[in-house]
Amino acid sequence: GAADMGTGCDTTLAQIAAEVLDCPLDNITVFGADTDTSPYDSGSYASSTTYVTGKATEKCAMKLRGQICKLGAELLECTEDEVEFDGKDVFKSKDPTQKKSLSEIAYASQFGHMVPLEATETHTSPLSPPPFMVGAAEVEVDTETGEVKLLEFDACVDCGTPINPNLTRVQTEGGLLQGIGMTLTENITYDKNGYPEENSLFQYKIPARTDVGKIKVEFESSYEPNGPFGAKSIGEVVINTPLP
């Protein structure tokens, strides 16, 4: 139910599910914005998608994994404690040659059983562990005109354990650019009648990548036990840091 607005959450949520189910990422399909197939989600905002929706995804995948093991154990005529699942087969721990493939288990769930293999979970976090970030900017200032040129911005972020380091880095770089634009170039003014004078992107100047110098991003890894695989959020913190 979480909408991917450019943050890459469809990929991140698929990675979480694939990790739990021990399957390739290509085996996971995300219906992120289809109310006919996906459950209600509070929205992709407030630094909550990976931390909250990601945890719901992890819990849901764990429940589905448990159902797979349970049905596999029934087909193998043993208890759940006696089997393991490697993403392809459910097999007996003491005799791996006795196994049932995932396709066999899926077939059995549709024929001869009243309930198919499916799971639904909800998650609300009792905590909101903050991410941390430090930033340093090198600027060049024209003392006569007041023009400020950003030469380099260095950032180090603690967002727990990044689920997808590449997407996390891009999210950080994009957020930094938004914060830099808010600080240096973006402004709204109003005429005497109260109408905004910046009514298009020709007047409202947002920075392009070529308007800033080097942007360097590093991560200080930590582990948040309440997040999916140790992840925390990384949304507002990367926008807010350049502002001071």
Features from the language model and the residues they span:
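C-terminal catalytic domains of large/alpha subunits in multi-subunit enzymes
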Residues: 15-244
